[in-house]
Amino acid sequence: MTILSAITSISRPNKISKSVISSNGGSSLSMGSNSVSCYNACGGGSSYSYSSSYSGSGLDYSYKANYSSSTGYNSSVVIASSTCHCS
């Protein structure tokens, strides 16, 4: 992916408006213009850590959400760009 196409894709994150991951109290990832916001990510006393990675083309991105807790969790959802850390 070229820098130009990456900028174009990130600046137009209108394909997906919201994505939600729920576990141990739940975490909600809501997408703004170019941002991802975390809400209630530390419910149940768990420690959450989110990191983003991009794949595909156009407005398709792979957002990988990982958090460490007593049970452990690893998932990925399609969403626009950004990174969120909650503890």
From Swiss-Prot:
InterPro entries: HssA/B-like_chaperone, HssA/B-related. GO terms for biological process: sorocarp development. Belongs to the hssA/B family. This is HssA/B-like protein 54. It comes from Dictyostelium discoideum.
